[in-house]
Amino acid sequence: MQNSTCQAVGECRVPEHAVLPQPLYREVVQFIESLPQKEGHLVTVLHKAQSVFGYLPIEVQQFVADHMEVPLAQVYGVVSFYTFFTMVPKGKYPISVCMGTACFVKGADKVVHAFKEQLKIDIGDVTPDGRFSIDTLRCVGGCALAPIVMVGEKVYGNVTPGQVKKILAEY
């Protein structure tokens, strides 16, 4: 662990200038300590960290690197390689539109456009109130329901641009 970047807080070492809440760091440390071994579990730990923090900024990546005893470059390499990891904050209700072949052919691009118009943001952005963000996915494996939209973990199938306003109203 790099003492120059961490400050002791109970059983957990958080970055000295941590912007994110300290209890969240403790949750990640407890998860790491529950593993039978650290080796081979970096992706699992990053999933946990992202579920706890909502995203993986460099501060969290350094924290994970320190506690997993791996170089920051290795953590960054994993985070930047896999598309399910994000280094930027998402909205409270992240919207993901599938752009796989079946979804695209059935109008997913028009659905994306409708979300962008309703929320007045672009892909990758977050609404000013922090409620929504929009991203696209390659394929979610539900081609029979194309086009598919996910809001958080909730899946919507056969979505049309006309349904976008109703979907947003649920949140």
From Swiss-Prot:
Cofactor(s) in the UniProt record: [2Fe-2S] cluster
Residues holding [2Fe-2S] cluster: C98, C103, C139, C143
Record's cofactor remark: Binds 1 [2Fe-2S] cluster.
The reaction(s) this protein catalyses: H2 + NADP(+) = NADPH + H(+)
pH dependence of activity: Optimum pH is 8.
Notes on activation and inhibition: Inhibited by oxygen.
InterPro entries with a match to the protein in the record: NADP_DH_HndA-like, NuoE-like, NuoE_dom, NuoE_N, Thioredoxin-like_sf
Gene Ontology molecular function, alphabetical: 2 iron, 2 sulfur cluster binding; hydrogen dehydrogenase (NADP+) activity; metal ion binding
EC number: 1.12.1.3
Enzyme class: oxidoreductase
Origin superkingdom: Bacteria
Keyword line: 2Fe-2S, Iron, Iron-sulfur, Metal-binding, NADP, Oxidoreductase
Pfam families: 2Fe-2S_thioredx (PF01257)
Role description: Catalyzes the reduction of NADP in the presence of molecular H(2) to yield NADPH.
Subunit structure: Heterotetramer composed of HndA, HndB, HndC and HndD subunits. HndA and HndB could form a heterodimeric intermediate in the electron transfer between the active site of hydrogenase subunit HndD and the NADP reduction site of the reducing subunit HndC.
Family indicated by similarity: Belongs to the complex I 24 kDa subunit family.
This protein's name: NADP-reducing hydrogenase subunit HndA
Gene giving rise to this polypeptide: hndA
